[in-house]
């Protein structure tokens, strides 16, 4: 026996008013269906079947996974018809879990409880109680037992008053589900083959039906339009913010924090407002992230601070470093311990050594900077000739004066001093002072031009 997961992703999503298939619309910068696929893997899916229809080429382009079995639903004739397309791919003794590509917030823990609630010869449903159940299929019970589901358009007044609703998520035995699906008809207001009709069949066959509720109703929220998509995004971010705060992080305003990847935190991490986390980010102990900063695929060491409005991507920042405000660190940047990078500094494929400082208005690209180096304001490494990139090497204890250009390839020896306003085109030896600026001239009795009226 194995667990087969069938993910329904064939809908066009007309109300999105988009050429993009609905399940490819992003939540936290990732397609909704990708969230569902990842959750299915976490609960131990041995076979993953993705039922697709509209936008097949785009789906296969965006969702590239070797463990997916792509199942075509050529005509969208309802959820029951969609699941039935996967019948040839599961065995009678398998368990079949049905999920939906537009409900990205469902949690692995909820699905584990659902799987555990299913009797060996039974079925388990995920249901939720809503204050406003309009639009959802109602759970019909008799003497406390689930006996069926009635869709909104087919419900009578008594059934419309029911607040327990169907989420569509269920798990059943493969053989039983095969039998029930084969008996579906489309004699209903929508003219579709409803997956929900198998519940009444299961009851008629004396199949035990368990019902499980998610911890939070937001787990089963879907998106049919862009308003609901935005609501999903906020619900997702609320879940992530709460998880981080429970783990010990301080979020100055949880409602103004976006996690669009994964974040690993140490102790006493403080994150100010409007911070965006993308990719895989690791923050050490006692790290502070300033307002409006964007972090992507980076590691920040203990007791380091990123000041407001800094953008850090693909960088490694050691312990006790200071970055920003208004700093951009691009891929390949490494800051060693106690390094400081200040406002309006950009670094790319550059290393700043232990205790070195680069405080203002500087570009360091393709550069190796040693320990205890001072980089003056306005320094530029000229690393590109229009075709090729070249490296600048600055050894330990160098002092670089303001407004200096280093034309790569060039090496500055240990302890050298570069005078402000210099353009360095040749290597500099250890402990040398180099000044290349034009000598200052004094012109007496100079009269500035006067505009003619």
From Swiss-Prot:
Residues annotated as the enzyme's active site: 360
Segment Linker: which positions?
Answer: 227-247
What are the start and end residues of every segment in region (Pyrophosphorylase)? Answer: 1-226
Q: Which GO terms describe its biological process?
A: cell morphogenesis; cell wall organization; lipid A biosynthetic process; peptidoglycan biosynthetic process; regulation of cell shape; UDP-N-acetylglucosamine biosynthetic process
Which GO molecular function, any one, fits this protein according to its record?
UDP-N-acetylglucosamine diphosphorylase activity
Pathway(s) of this molecule: Nucleotide-sugar biosynthesis; UDP-N-acetyl-alpha-D-glucosamine biosynthesis; N-acetyl-alpha-D-glucosamine 1-phosphate from alpha-D-glucosamine 6-phosphate (route II): step 2/2; Nucleotide-sugar biosynthesis; UDP-N-acetyl-alpha-D-glucosamine biosynthesis; UDP-N-acetyl-alpha-D-glucosamine from N-acetyl-alpha-D-glucosamine 1-phosphate: step 1/1; Bacterial outer membrane biogenesis; LPS lipid A biosynthesis
Q: Can you state which reaction this protein catalyses?
A: alpha-D-glucosamine 1-phosphate + acetyl-CoA = N-acetyl-alpha-D-glucosamine 1-phosphate + CoA + H(+); N-acetyl-alpha-D-glucosamine 1-phosphate + UTP + H(+) = UDP-N-acetyl-alpha-D-glucosamine + diphosphate
Q: Which cofactors does it use?
A: Mg(2+)
Enzyme Commission number(s): 2.7.7.23, 2.3.1.157
Signal peptide (residue range): none
Tell me where in or outside the cell this protein is found.
Answer: Cytoplasm
Where is Mg(2+) annotated to bind? Answer: 102, 224
Query: Under the cellular component aspect of Gene Ontology, which terms does the record hold?
Result: cytoplasm; membrane
CDD domains named among the record's database cross-references: GT2_GlmU_N_bac, LbH_GlmU_C
Query: Which residue stretches belong to region N-acetyltransferase?
Result: 248-453
Provide the top EC class. Answer: transferase
Short name of any one Pfam family annotated for the protein: Hexapep
Cite the entry's keywords alphabetically: Acyltransferase, Cell shape, Cell wall biogenesis/degradation, Cytoplasm, Magnesium, Metal-binding, Multifunctional enzyme, Nucleotidyltransferase, Peptidoglycan synthesis, Repeat, Transferase
The residues that the entry says bind UDP-N-acetyl-alpha-D-glucosamine are 8-11, 22, 73, 78-79, 100-102, 137, 151, 166, 224, 330, 348, 363, 374
Q: How does it assemble?
A: Homotrimer.
Question: What role does it play?
Answer: Catalyzes the last two sequential reactions in the de novo biosynthetic pathway for UDP-N-acetylglucosamine (UDP-GlcNAc). The C-terminal domain catalyzes the transfer of acetyl group from acetyl coenzyme A to glucosamine-1-phosphate (GlcN-1-P) to produce N-acetylglucosamine-1-phosphate (GlcNAc-1-P), which is converted into UDP-GlcNAc by the transfer of uridine 5-monophosphate (from uridine 5-triphosphate), a reaction catalyzed by the N-terminal domain.
Q: Which PANTHER family match?
A: BIFUNCTIONAL PROTEIN GLMU (PTHR43584:SF3), NUCLEOTIDYL TRANSFERASE (PTHR43584)
Q: What is this protein called?
A: Bifunctional protein GlmU
């Amino acid at each position: 026996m194995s667990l087969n997961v069938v993910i329904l992703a064939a809908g066009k999503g007309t109300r999105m008013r988009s050429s993009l298939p609905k399940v490819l619309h992003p939540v936290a910068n990732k397609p909704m269906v990708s969230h569902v696929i990842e959750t299915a893997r976490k609960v131990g899916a041995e076979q993953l079947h993705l039922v697709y229809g509209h936008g097949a080429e785009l789906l296969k382009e965006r969702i590239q996974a070797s463990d997916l079995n792509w199942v075509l639903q050529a005509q969208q004739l309802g959820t029951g018809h969609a699941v039935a397309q996967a019948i040839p791919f599961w065995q009678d003794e398998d368990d079949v879990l049905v999920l939906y590509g537009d409900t990205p917030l469902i949690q692995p823990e909820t699905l584990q409880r659902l799987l555990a609630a299913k009797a060996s010869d039974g079925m388990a449903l995920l249901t939720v109680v809503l204050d406003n159940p309009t639009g959802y299929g109602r759970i019909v019970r008799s003497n406390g037992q689930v006996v069926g589901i009635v869709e909104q358009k087919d419900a009578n007044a008594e059934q419309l008053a029911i607040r327990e609703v169907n989420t569509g998520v269920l798990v059943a035995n493969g053989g039983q589900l095969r039998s029930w699906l084969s008996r579906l008809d489309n004699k209903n207001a929508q003219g579709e083959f409803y997956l929900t009709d198998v519940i009444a069949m299961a009851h008629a066959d004396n199949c035990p039906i368990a019902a499980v509720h998610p911890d939070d109703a937001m787990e089963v929220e879907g998106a049919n339009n862009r308003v609901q998509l935005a609501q999903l995004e906020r619900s997702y971010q609320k879940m992530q913010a709460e998880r981080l705060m429970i783990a010990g992080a301080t979020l100055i305003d949880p409602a103004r924090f976006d996690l669009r990847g994964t974040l690993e935190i140490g102790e006493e991490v403080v994150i100010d407002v409007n911070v965006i986390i993308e990719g895989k980010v690791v923050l050490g102990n006692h790290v502070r992230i300033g307002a409006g900063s964007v972090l992507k695929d980076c590691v920040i060491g203990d007791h380091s601070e990123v000041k407001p409005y800094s953008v850090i991507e693909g960088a490694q920042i050691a312990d006790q470093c200071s970055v920003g405000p208004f700093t951009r660190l691009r891929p390949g940047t490494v800051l060693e311990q106690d390094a400081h990078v200040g406002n309006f500094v950009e670094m790319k494929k550059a290393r700043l050594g232990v205790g070195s400082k680069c405080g203002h208005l500087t570009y360091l690209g393709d550069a190796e900077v040693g320990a205890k180096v001072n980089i003056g304001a306005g320094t530029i490494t000229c690393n590109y000739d229009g075709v090729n990139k070249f490296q600048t090497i600055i050894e330990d204890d160098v002092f670089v004066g303001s407004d200096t250009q280093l034309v790569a390839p060039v090496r500055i020896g240990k302890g050298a001093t570069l005078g402000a306003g210099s353009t360095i085109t040749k290597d500099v030896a250890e402990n040398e002072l180099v000044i290349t600026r034009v000598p200052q001239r004094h012109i007496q009795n100079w009269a500035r031009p006067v505009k003619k009226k």
